[in-house]
């Protein structure tokens, strides 16, 4: 059958269910439209059904509203609701009236993840109801004067706000072309007109498939020009207002000036309301278009970040939510973040924390979280006083998680760790730790606590009362490696807090076995290794918990993961401070095992440094010193490592070799010779080269070359030494013994005692002021001062 035979169209509307809107004060009316095409004889040719819905917004509904009257009015005005449903409407309205505004946490999260659509506003709300069939009339209005253009655009906007109409509007190229032209030509003539037309295109921008249409008409670029213009206008308004305010302040008795100022201020307020409606819809359109990163880059090149940061000075919550949401999206790219830094964004955001508007506070915290990945911006956050403000939010379940993440990032910087001691942060965190019912504590919470425990002042607060006891109890109960890592950080600080651990040495030592999880054992070992307490009987601990076989077994290459082996080495270094422990370890054959491990891990500076430190501890004790010097090749390894590129390794080597040299003359000579050779290597090479030049006739023989450099002991060659007047006479008037009165460290004369044998001894029989255990990748020693450069 041909199309022209279809002469008649029959439309039937059938009412359906009525529901309440999930988040707004509104009713949703469901209805069904059945369209049937009738033939010439009235018989149906083609039919289609479509389910639709209408939203009835009830702006005036509040606690004092007369529900019965409002229900009657709704039924009378909405033809889709049958009068028989009056009681149902009344019940729904009663429910809306009494429904709490606060949503559940999950709903809030979903709701705040995207700003709300712009509401109806002046110029958009007209009495006339738009009809899709009257589009030609509305298009004609766009060719008339400004008031008619505003009316025409408002009617088209009514249609565009219903997503069901968008596809039909998309096909109407005449309408879209006219709207784009009017916006381009007349946006400066009327804010209402510009707002209406941008809102129409915003409706299209809510759906990704229509973004090509907006790009085609270059609406995005036009919106950016409009936003830039409006922001500059706002600055001019503020300047004018400021001048008039200043005039009033200078002459408070002048009523004419005061009235003029009040009139200007009232006008300014009206203009700002309309302007913010325009800014909001234009920015929302751009935010939707920014789904495409290429489009976002174009916006960035047109200074979108500067515009958005300027808009942060506004007071309109809905506009601010949109602006901050946009900035949050942009902040994930470094270039945009750098633009935000230039505009001092942190200073502008700090005024929003805290604020009454939950959604704004939530999205602002999320933006700050993105920005807090930048070290300079974290510094700025502390400078502007965000630390106590964020700490105060830890008590609010809605913001606790995000605030904690920002604070965690701030706590990563050692400069700011101590500042947490002057806030209410630590008591709140301890409360959260102890109230946590799960076996594993939230990762954000425990990570934050681990960072804070790296600072001595914070640790004093953590250990107040039964703090440490409660932490130990929980860590041992649940075998939590992260909580034990926090305890390990606590244990590294010298002073009263370290002595608290004496009560838990047995509990910790009992965890050192192959039966426990390796991660947990690593942290327990690390905690024990930090306990450099003179009164602690390490020999008793090693024997009672049978730790020596465990430690020796783990030293075998490949016996365990490197992290665990390293902790074992550090633990051996700690217990080796005790004379009886060092002897116990030497008897067990741990020293050869350490040398074997040193060979296997010679490329790993951290392993090398910690193993050398064990040797350093052991050479203080007679039993282990003799084993190291006479039965192992440890001194030879130390000589090889004397000039390692790692400063920490060199330092430990020097100190260890100095002690070996004091107790063994043969090694003393080798060590001193090597130090001299290294320190003067450049000069020795030059002398050797000169001697070679003078002795070219002996080039193929060793007679003249041998005595100079290659074979003899350098310290037996006084003819190569300098004195204050130049080279010492070659006849050897000064004996090498002259140099035995000086302590050479890396070749530098540092004193007139050979080696530090006369230094005072501490509780372990060690010289006072000797070097401490070298830092590991785990962290710095607690008593090591920090020096930081404060960048601009």
Curated annotation (Swiss-Prot):
Coiled-coil zones: none
PTM annotation: Phosphorylated on tyrosine residues by SRC in vitro; this reduces the binding affinity of the protein for RAP1GDS1.
GO cellular component: axoneme; centrosome; ciliary basal body; ciliary tip; ciliary transition zone; cilium; condensed nuclear chromosome; cytosol
Protein name: Kinesin-associated protein 3
Pfam families the record matches: KAP
MF (Gene Ontology): intraciliary transport particle B binding; kinesin binding; protein phosphatase binding
Keywords from the UniProt entry: Phosphoprotein, Repeat
ARM repeats: 333-373, 374-412, 494-533, 578-620, 621-662
Function: Involved in tethering the chromosomes to the spindle pole and in chromosome movement. Binds to the tail domain of the KIF3A/KIF3B heterodimer to form a heterotrimeric KIF3 complex and may regulate the membrane binding of this complex.
Record-level GO BP terms: anterograde dendritic transport of neurotransmitter receptor complex; cardiac muscle cell apoptotic process; cilium organization; microtubule-based movement; microtubule-based process; negative regulation of cardiac muscle cell apoptotic process; negative regulation of neuroblast proliferation; negative regulation of thymocyte apoptotic process
Modification sites for Phosphoserine: 60
Subunit structure: Heterotrimer of KIFAP3, KIF3A and KIF3B. Interacts with RAP1GDS1/SMG GDS. Interacts with SMC3 subunit of the cohesin complex.
Basic and acidic residues: compositionally biased ranges: 103-119
Alphabetical list of SMART domains matching this protein: ARM (SM00185), KAP (SM01297)
Region (Disordered) residue spans: 103-124
């Amino acid at each position: 059958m041909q199309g022209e035979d279809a002469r008649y169209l029959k439309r039937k509307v059938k009412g359906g269910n009525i529901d309440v809107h999930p988040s707004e004060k509104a009713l949703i009316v469901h209805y069904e439209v059945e369209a049937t095409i009738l033939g010439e004889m009235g018989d149906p040719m083609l039919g289609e059904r479509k389910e639709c819905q209408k939203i009835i917004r009830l702006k005036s509904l509040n606690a004092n509203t007369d529900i019965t009257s409002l229900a009657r009015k709704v039924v009378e005005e909405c033809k889709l609701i049958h009068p028989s449903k009056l009681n149902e409407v009344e019940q729904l309205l009663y429910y809306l009236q009494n429904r709490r505004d606060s949503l559940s946490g999950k709903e809030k999260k979903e709701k705040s993840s995207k700003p709300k659509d712009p509401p109806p506003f002046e110029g958009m709300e007209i009495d006339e109801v738009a009809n899709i069939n009257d589009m030609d009339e509305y298009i004609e209005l766009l060719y008339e004067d400004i008031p008619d253009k505003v009316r025409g655009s408002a009617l088209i906007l009514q249609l565009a706000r219903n997503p069901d109409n968008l596809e039909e509007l998309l096909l109407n190229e005449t309408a879209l072309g006219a709207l784009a032209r009017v916006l381009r030509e007349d946006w400066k003539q009327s804010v209402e007109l510009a707002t209406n037309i941008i809102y129409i295109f915003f409706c299209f921008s809510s759906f990704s498939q229509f973004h090509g249409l907006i790009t085609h008409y270059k609406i995005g670029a036009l919106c950016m020009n409009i936003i830039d213009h409006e922001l500059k206008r706002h600055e001019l308004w503020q300047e004018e207002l400021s001048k008039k305010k200043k005039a009033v302040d200078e002459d408070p008795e002048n009523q004419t000036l005061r009235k003029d100022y009040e009139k200007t201020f009232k006008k300014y307020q009206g203009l700002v309301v309309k302007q913010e409606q325009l800014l909001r819809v234009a920015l929302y359109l751009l935010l939707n278009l920014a789904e495409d990163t290429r489009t976002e880059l174009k916006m960035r090149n047109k200074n979108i970040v500067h515009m958005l940061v300027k808009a942060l000075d506004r007071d309109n919550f809905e506009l601010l939510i949109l602006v901050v949401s946009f900035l949050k999206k942009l902040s994930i790219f470094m270039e945009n973040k750098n633009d935000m830094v230039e505009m001092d964004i942190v200073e502008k955001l700090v005024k929003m924390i805290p604020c009454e508007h939950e959604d704004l506070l939530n999205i602002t915290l999320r933006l700050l979280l993105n920005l807090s990945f930048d070290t300079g911006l974290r510094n700025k956050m502390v400078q502007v006083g965000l630390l106590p403000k964020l700490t105060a939010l830890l008590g609010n379940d809605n913001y606790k998680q995000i605030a904690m993440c920002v604070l965690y990032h701030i706590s990563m910087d050692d400069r700011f760790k101590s500042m947490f001691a002057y806030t209410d942060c630590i008591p709140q965190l301890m409360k959260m730790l102890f109230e946590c019912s799960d076996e594993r504590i939230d990762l954000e919470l425990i990570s934050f606590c681990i960072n804070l425990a790296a600072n001595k002042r914070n640790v004093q607060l953590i250990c107040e009362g039964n703090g440490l006891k409660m932490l130990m109890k929980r860590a041992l109960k649940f075998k939590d490696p992260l909580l034990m890592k926090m305890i390990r950080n606590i244990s590294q600080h010298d002073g009263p807090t370290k002595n608290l651990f004496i009560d838990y040495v047995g509990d910790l030592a009992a965890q050192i076995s192959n039966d426990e999880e390796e991660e947990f054992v690593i942290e327990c070992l690390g905690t024990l290794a930090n306990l450099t307490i003179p009164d602690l009987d390490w020999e008793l601990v090693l024997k009672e918990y049978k730790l020596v076989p465990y430690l020796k077994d783990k030293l075998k290459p490949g016996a365990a993961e490197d992290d665990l082996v390293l902790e074992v080495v550090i633990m051996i270094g700690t217990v080796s401070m005790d004379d009886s422990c060092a002897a116990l370890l030497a008897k067990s054959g741990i020293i050869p095992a350490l040398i074997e491990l040193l060979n296997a891990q010679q490329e790993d500076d951290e392993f090398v440094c910690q193993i050398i430190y064990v040797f350093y501890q052991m050479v203080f004790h007679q039993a282990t010193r003799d084993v190291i010097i006479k039965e192992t090749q440890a001194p030879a390894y130390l000589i090889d490592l004397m000039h390692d590129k790692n400063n920490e390794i060199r330092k430990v080597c020097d100190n260890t070799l100095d002690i070996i040299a004091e107790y063994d003359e043969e090694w003393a000579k080798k060590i001193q010779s090597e130090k001299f050779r290294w320190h003067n290597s450049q000069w020795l090479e030059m002398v050797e080269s000169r001697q070679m030049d003078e002795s070219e006739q002996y080039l193929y023989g060793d007679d003249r070359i041998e005595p100079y450099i290659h074979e003899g002991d350098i310290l037996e060659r006084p003819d190569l030494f300098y004195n204050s007047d130049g080279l010492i006479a070659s006849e050897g008037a000064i004996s090498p013994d002259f140099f035995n009165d000086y302590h050479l460290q890396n070749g530098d004369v540092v004193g007139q005692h050979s080696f530090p044998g006369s230094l005072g001894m501490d509780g372990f029989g060690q010289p006072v002021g000797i070097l401490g255990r070298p830092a590991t990748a785990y962290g710095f020693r607690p008593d090591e001062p920090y020096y930081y450069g404060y960048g601009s």
